[in-house]
């Protein structure tokens, strides 16, 4: 974009870490759970939907076209936010995002912060059922060999680095985290493994998140 070369290096680095701007000929919008189009303000998140002459018309072998909305936008399954200059930052996948009290929490962003702790070898975050908020984040951690790391320390490490209501409800330590054939963390297997995980002090279902 014109003028980028004049930006301070730290601001330029932030832009370079984003996924870029929509290419010519593609309409792009960010949509929430209710189908409401989200503003390009660098904060609002939702599913990325695209429309254009060379966007796929559907999935091969699937007769019912459920991949597009009534306006012809294709749901990519990516969760992202757009800044005012049109640069996109992908934060998660719709199947992995944690929907808590009507808000979306990025599992990937939580994982990226957690692995910044020197005692964390690998981390995964999934949503587990909660009677009040529908889902709450659960942090699953593999410690580095020979180091001590407790629940309070790793959860405290996240404070100030993410929104307060993003802080996982609990943290568990494991010896192994399942992966797919391509080397990605298998959130599907983790959701099955921890489907009935008891969140300590989960209150009865009442009201909305505050």
Predicted segments, located by residue:
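Secondary-structure boundary/capping positions in well-ordered alpha/beta enzyme cores
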Residues: 26, 120-121, 165, 169, ...
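General small-molecule cofactor/ligand-binding pocket signal
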Residues: 171-174
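Short, positively charged
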Residues: 6-11, 153-160, 199-200
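AMP-binding/adenylate-forming catalytic core of the ANL superfamily
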Residues: 52, 57-58, 79-166, 176, ...
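Conserved AMP-binding/adenylate-forming
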Residues: 1-87, 94-97, 111
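Phosphopantetheine-dependent thiolation modules in NRPS/PKS and related acyl-activating systems
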Residues: 184-210
